[in-house]
């Protein structure tokens, strides 16, 4: 009897839950990226959902870009998200590495004009092996270029520039004059959480 009652409670609990369809932000087309289940709407908010950029845009060439979104708003059975970061797959990164060349990683924190802090990891791939001074010059140029550009953009503009590859193209044009450069990729981004203001009352 105890087992039957326990099973009944499990069925009841499952029936009490609802499915919510999850969508990307407006600037990424409000694309459907999956479903999540919950018994209460409030427990849906804050959940992290992932999808490849290829799935979002129906472009198989972008399957190597993994996008992360946080559910920020729920209306009916629809859950709307905000972008929290992206990362390029390791297999794709390995395919970019060539012998007798350098991969130069650069970690940059930028602040957008709508006051969002974003950490970016950029990889610069050269045709030949660069020395320490050349690597330093490339990192400085990438950092200065990104920080200056980000101040003129809001978060949505920055995200669009990252996923479209436009920012990478701009950085490539900037650094190729300093050292023979094969490719520049923004391989990772993360939107930093801003702490709530502390009340002084």
Curated annotation (Swiss-Prot):
Q: Does the UniProt entry include the keyword Nuclease?
A: no
Give one Pfam hit by family name: Ribosomal_S3Ae
- What superkingdom does the record give? Archaea
Q: Does the keyword Ribosomal protein apply?
A: yes
Which InterPro entries does the entry link to? Ribosomal_eS1 (IPR001593), Ribosomal_eS1_arc (IPR030838)
Q: Name one GO biological process term.
A: translation
Per the record, GO CC terms? ribonucleoprotein complex; ribosome
HAMAP family according to UniProt: Ribosomal_eS1
Concerning its family, UniProt says:
Belongs to the eukaryotic ribosomal protein eS1 family.
Task: Please state what the protein is called.
Answer: Small ribosomal subunit protein eS1
Source organism of the structure = Methanoregula boonei (strain DSM 21154 / JCM 14090 / 6A8)
* Designated gene of the protein: rps3ae
